[in-house]
Amino acid sequence: MKTATALLALVVAFYARDARATAPHPMLPPALAKAVAEFDRAQMQGDGAALGRLLADDYVLFNSRGLVEDKAAFIHDYTAPGTSMKPFTVEDEVVRHWPGGAVLGGVATLEGTSEGKPYKVRLRFADIWAERDGRWQVVFTEATRAPAP
């Protein structure tokens, strides 16, 4: 169960793709685009301190198994030994922005290792961002298993 939770936490790595040289969504406010890029790097590098800044204290993940995960569990999943994630492409992207908030999501096939064991899972997900006290943070993520293309 711990492995499954770690796998599903990886879904929030929305912008982790091969083509990182360009901004993922130039229509986003610069501060949000920067936070998204930092969040991406923090997940890929297992940077717990950065994740701690970029996840809201009241962050919640509803994973594809119907389990609920909080900020501490999410950070643990990304910083645990034997965890890695390969770059991936997001399909059917959803990008919505309004003053103080945003939804970023899509469908991705994720591959990597969790607790040293390989995994591959296809998920549809949504990350909810909020601007609080002048900084952008992820406040909520939902993940659902997606059918094969």
Question: Where are the regions that the model predicts?
Answer:
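Bacterial N-terminal signal peptides that target proteins for export
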Residues: 1-6
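A beta-strand edge to alpha-helix "cap/lid" segment located at domain peripheries
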Residues: 22-55, 60-149
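N-terminal signal peptide c-region/cleavage motif recognized by signal peptidases
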Residues: 13-16
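Cleavable N-terminal signal peptides
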Residues: 8-9, 19
